[in-house]
């Protein structure tokens, strides 16, 4: 695992990413940076993380896996700093189940408790929402 993280990080160093397409998880995660493991100042580009129960259940809810016992308990993920190195950040967020995470992203404290909140610091980040995922946002 460490060797694969190092290999992947080397590729990211050698071939910098211009466009990052990501989503926001039900717990506010970006990539697999769940609230318990997200680090806005992580020195690594890629790391192995333990997936929290909310994230694992989301994989089943979104039909990525048939059952919870089939969802891995660990994953390789780009770290928050690695994601933010992209020149353009596009975040696509469907589903009503993510409405609270979207609200926290846009109106909550910028902190690792809602990793997606860091996107508010990025001038080139674009958030694409559905009516369902935006349902808890104030009307403008």
Label for each model-derived stretch:
Residues 1-140:
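Conserved phosphate- and dinucleotide-binding cores of soluble alpha/beta proteins
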């Amino acid at each position: 695992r460490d060797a694969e993280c190092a290999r992947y990080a080397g590729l990211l160093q050698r071939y910098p990413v211009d466009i990052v397409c990501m989503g926001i998880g039900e717990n506010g995660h970006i990539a697999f940076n769940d609230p318990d493991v997200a680090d806005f100042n992580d020195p690594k580009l890629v790391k192995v993380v333990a997936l929290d129960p909310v994230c694992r259940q989301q994989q089943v809810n979104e039909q990525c896996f048939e059952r919870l016992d089939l969802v891995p308990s660990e994953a390789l993920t780009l770290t928050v700093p690695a994601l933010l190195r992209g020149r353009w950040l596009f975040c696509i967020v469907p589903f009503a189940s993510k409405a609270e995470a979207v609200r926290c992203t846009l109106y909550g404290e910028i902190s690792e408790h809602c990793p997606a909140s860091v996107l508010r610091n990025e001038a080139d980040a674009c958030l694409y929402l559905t009516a369902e995922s935006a349902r808890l946002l104030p009307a403008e």
